[in-house]
Amino acid sequence: MEIEILNTHKNDFSPVIGERTMELLSRFGQKLDEDGIDTLSSETIEILSHCTNPYKNEVQSVTNLVVGYVQSGKTMSFTTLSALAHDNGFRIIIYFAGTKNNLLSQTTKRLRKDLINGSANSAYYKLFENPTLEYAQRIRNALNISSKPTILITVLKHHKYISDLAAMFNSMQLKQTLGKAGVLIIDDEADQASLNGYAYKNSKSEEWEDDEYTTTYSSIMKLKGALANHSYIQYTATPQGPLLISIMDLLSPKHHTVLTPGKTYTGGKTFFCDEPGLIITIPEGEVFHSKHNNLADCPDSLVNALQLHLMGVAIIVKLLQKESFLSMMIHADRDQDASEKFYRWIKNIIDAWSNILANGEQDLGYQELKDSFAKCYPESIRMYEAHNESAPSFEDIWCCIDDIILDTNVELVISRNKRQGENKEIDWASSCSHILVGADMLNRGFTVEHLAVTSVSYTHLTLPTKL
């Protein structure tokens, strides 16, 4: 095996904000205030300044780490990084977009929406998803366009697709054309699947020739080896893995940047430290477990959570008109049978409530249903009272419930759901209320927009896995 010593990266690259970054930031200004835009700009410049110089015609590489809280804007960060990379001469950006097809699709659509912006920026960016060797000529042609567009490549974090990508960059069509031009590799959720799972075992071996490597890690090494001038940027909310691996590992970061969450961000600190009252504990007997507590009927705690969600929609969407929709997420167990069971429960409850409300007060179940919602009313407004804010009356909320139930979209998000498929996109704007029931496809990285209520069954047997 031949070992090539790459030039160590020197901090002689000073990126500047150009037209594409300014245009993107102006659109992000609809979501962020002036301080938020300034923070996003400065942190993005810092990240790119530690990357290799795309204009240096030499073999070079570096690995850097970007740490951000869960759902705190990491995607916005690497989207802005992409625009800044374009403005500063990077020709190709590769995104490891998760281990599930729905995550790949989500990232591809976000990049198309935010960077290409319909067709407004199609001259500046060319987007490819999971390209193989057959794409080599198309990407070569794109690299030769006189306007020098940046090639955006999203790829599933799986050894087959990454190996295919490495083969494409090693092809005769691309290798000479790309040369030593700057390439970014953005690894989303970098601590998941990318690192070598045999690292600890290898550390006990006396001979490095006997080291073993996981398939995804090996494919990443192939890809890095195919790119003469590249920067590998790890994005994660859980950086322990990248930080604790051997500093000799090529995925060990040399620099790190900690992202600043927005002013309105709420995360673990909010829920578990500042506002612990936002957490409601499910009674032990109602905690689902596929082997040890396989519930036959929908537990009362889930019914109450559903009622709180619907009442939240009434308050936030219908009465206060602060948002156009709210979402609820339900995760029972990794077993897909459990997700299907919970989905049936929710659908049946929603349909039953809709029928009762359609019949009106003459329905024998009408008053009982209204009373059950009334019991949840104090919980639905508790945080308003805690912060000395006025809250709508129960009667005002109840008047909205019928329409909200009729406009509630319930989705089963599992891989074997043939009707939906892994790449089904949630049409968030279509309903005022969304309920997503799922297992691993609702794992980290998947964005549930306007999430207001989460119902998750934890036992001492499943807590470490789910966290």
What do these predicted ranges mean?
Residues 33-64:
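Conserved pre-motif I regulatory segment
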Residues 459-467:
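Conserved small/polar residues in nucleotide/adenosyl-binding loops
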Residues 77:
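Hydrophobic positions on the alpha1 helix immediately C-terminal to the Walker A/P-loop
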Residues 92-112:
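Conserved Walker A/P-loop ATP-binding site and its immediately adjacent core
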Residues 134-181, 201, 215-219:
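Conserved RecA-like ASCE ATPase "motif II neighborhood" in helicase/translocase motors
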